[in-house]
Amino acid sequence: MKRIKCLLHSFAAFLFTGIAASFFVQTLVSCSNDPVLVNPEGFAGSIGGKETGLWTISNGDMVLQATNYGGRVVSLWVPEGNGEMVDVVLGHGTLDEYVNYRRERFLGAVVGPVANRIVGASYSHDGRTYRLSANHNGTGTLHGGFRGLDSVVWDFVSQTDSSLTFHCLHPDGAEGFPGNLDILMTYTLTSDCTWKIDYLATTDAVRPVNISNHPYFNLGGEGSGTCGDYVLWVNADSFLGTDGPDVIETPILVEGTAFDYRTPHLVRDALESGDPQIVRSNGGFDHNFCINGEGMREAASLYNPSNGILLSVWTDQPGLQLYSGQWWTGEERGKNGKSLDRFGSFTFETQNWPDAPNKPSFPNPFLEPGETYTHHCEYRFRIME
């Protein structure tokens, strides 16, 4: 592969107790190493009579590989401050590992048709109650049930040098959801080192829709250590707490809690806080933040001081699920044979609020015939100097 010329934006300044400077300095970096790509042969096969594969796209600055099994992102190479490329997402090197390794079935996948939790594995709408698959502790529905969007083979639609489009039909009655849900998803790499995700969906019956993506980020590369010393910022005045299997209906103000990241500070500050919500979630984040504002806006950012990479998350959705990888044990291995350690990754899942079908005060999750569901998400990568 030819050397990759990376046009990067770097922050002119960043205050660890304040806000990033509002202007950028453009820097042209010649990356000194080529990405070590996953071999597509490990993904060639079929599941349920549908062919599987691995596709590679690049914009000259970044390289992304994705499989149509669950629409998963397998690798994402971006430039770091020393002029080299680094793969910043966790993944596996073969299809078999994704299909048969079930400890973390959502690794890099599209999740839905209703991401996150539906408490009680049921919801009522227009006087009718819908019973769903109870795949979460036997009492709730998580990420669409036993066979969600992560566990099916998507149809390949089209590819350009820098974009890839998949299609999926979630059929009427699957996992208990009514109506046929027709979904298009496009991954795009833009010229400013951004990975864009766009979802479009239509239905022939009223049903809840909340599609998201589940990439695990380690900005130093898979197996490079924990994210505790990363600097986190979240654009949220409140978050949703949990109470056992339930999602607390009234948002909790972040003021005075371990969840207040309106000013950037270390991830480990929350992990070591002893906050009851953190303790209840095995010592880490697994919570929905109620993002301030509407429309396309910045929801959160994560900075790795060791290599200068800043990841900024933008979305038009009302919520952002933060998960700090506390359920990894170190016994698992990723695509490079390195251990997947506790707190060794971070997910930002742009979404509607969890359990919205059961909570009328939450943003409306229901899609009706004749309407189009849209969801836009951007992961923007920059180098800070």
Annotate each language-model stretch with its function.
Residues F11-T27:
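Bacterial N-terminal signal peptides
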